[in-house]
Swiss-Prot record:
Protein name: 7-methyl-GTP pyrophosphatase
Gene assigned in the entry: yceF1
Protein species of origin: Salmonella paratyphi A (strain ATCC 9150 / SARB42)
CC cofactor: a divalent metal cation
Enzyme class: hydrolase
CDD domains given in the database record: Maf
Cytoplasm recorded as keyword: yes
Any Gene Ontology biological process: nucleotide metabolic process
Amino acid sequence: MPRLILASTSPWRRALLEKLTIPFECAAPDVDETPMPGEAPRQLVLRLAQAKAQSLAARFPNHLIIGSDQICVLDGEITGKPLTEEKARQQLAKASGNIVTFYTGLALYNSASGHLQTEVEPFDVHFRHLSEAEIDDYVRKEHPLHCAGSFKSEGLGIALFERLEGRDPNTLIGLPLIALCQMLRREEMNPLNA
């Protein structure tokens, strides 16, 4: 049976995959994540997830390789990682009272057979109306500078929301486990009896 590789260095994706109790290794994919001109959010995350998984095929020739990529969209615009506190406050002010959609692309590539499975999972985050003081307090307490959308739903960020809508809450953190389990079963790797 092929071994499992997570094409990511994200500690959040690693922690999510550990929930399945299947042994795996992590490896950093070498992929240019620059969007193509006019590329739609769904197309972008699908292309990048697939590229991440396939980029490791030569290094891991008899493996199941998981690639994942996520973007955040608000008012039709891709919202990246803020990197500064000021940008985080701006992103949260814009999200206040609005719906932010996350698109997570998932790819599972069997490097032995060349079989590729892909999926894009949307997830909507309904923000409640936030005061400037709440935004300042949140950014100061959680420091979400390396998180798309400027929040961590697995932490204090949950206090920013009115409600969440999506098939799998793990999608919001970066790895849609329900879809991944379906893909793994198609490759004869059932997490329940692995």
